[in-house]
C-alpha cells in the first residue's frame, strides 16, 4: 500500500508541534556504548559515532481489514540536535539531514524496550544505501534507542469499519555509526 502523502505530512506536522511543545534538546547521551545499551545492539568494533539525534514524530499504522489488526506502515519524524531541526526520518527506513546526506537501513537486531507495552523496540540497523556528501554519507549502522511511545493502540486491534490509519506519537534517540571509509 502506498502511503498517502497527506498522512505523512500530518505526522510531520504533529512531530513539529510536539517539538515546539517540549524541549527538543532533551538530554541525548554522547555515546551509546556507555549508556546501558544491550550488547547485541552495539555496532561492530571499529565503528565510531558520528551523530546522535532526537527523533520526534509518529509511528504510522494502517488497519488491516482482513485481520482487524494494526500493521506498521512507516515512521514520520523530525530529527533534532541541541534543540535545532537537522533532518527528517521516513519510510525506508530512511534518515535525511538538511546537509543533503541520507542513509537507508535494514533491521539487524530488535530488542524489546524496557516498557514494551507502550514503547517501540530498540533496534540496530545496518545501512543498505547512502547518498550525498554530508554526515550520513558514510554511516554503516544506526541505533534506535530510549524509545517512548509509538506502539499500536488498543493492543494492536482495530475496527476495519471505522479505523483506517493512525499516527502514534513517539520519541527515540538515533545514533549513527561509521568506520570512516
What is the predicted role of each segment?
Residues 29-60, 67-181:
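Primary mode marks residue(s) on the alpha4-beta5-alpha5 output face of response regulator receiver
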Amino acid at each position: 500500500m502506498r502511503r498517502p502523502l497527506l498522512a505523512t505530512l500530518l505526522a510531520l506536522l504533529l512531530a513539529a508541534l510536539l517539538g515546539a511543545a517540549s524541549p527538543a534538546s532533551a538530554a541525548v547521551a554522547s555515546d551509546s556504548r556507555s549508556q546501558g545499551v544491550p550488547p547485541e545492539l552495539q555496532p561492530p568494533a571499529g565503528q565510531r559515532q558520528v551523530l546522535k539525534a532526537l527523533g520526534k514524530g509518529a509511528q504510522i499504522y494502517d488497519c488491516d481489514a482482513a485481520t482487524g489488526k494494526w500493521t506498521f506502515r512507516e515512521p514520520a519524524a523530525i530529527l533534532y540536535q541541541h534543540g535545532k531541526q537537522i533532518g527528517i526520518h521516513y519510510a525506508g527506513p530512511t534518515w535525511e539531514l538538511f546537509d543533503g546526506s541520507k542513509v537507508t537501513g535494514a533491521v539487524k537486531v530488535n530488542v524489546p524496550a524496557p516498557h514494551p507495552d507502550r514503547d517501540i523496540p530498540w533496534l540496530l540497523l545496518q545501512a543498505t544505501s547512502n547518498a550525498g556528501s554530508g554526515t550520513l554519507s558514510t554511516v554503516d549502522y544506526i541505533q534506535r534507542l530510549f524509545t517512548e511511545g509509538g506502539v499500536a493502540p488498543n493492543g494492536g486491534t482495530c475496527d476495519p469499519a471505522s479505523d483506517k490509519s493512525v499516527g502514534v506519537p513517539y520519541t527515540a534517540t538515533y545514533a549513527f555509526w561509521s568506520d570512516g571509509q
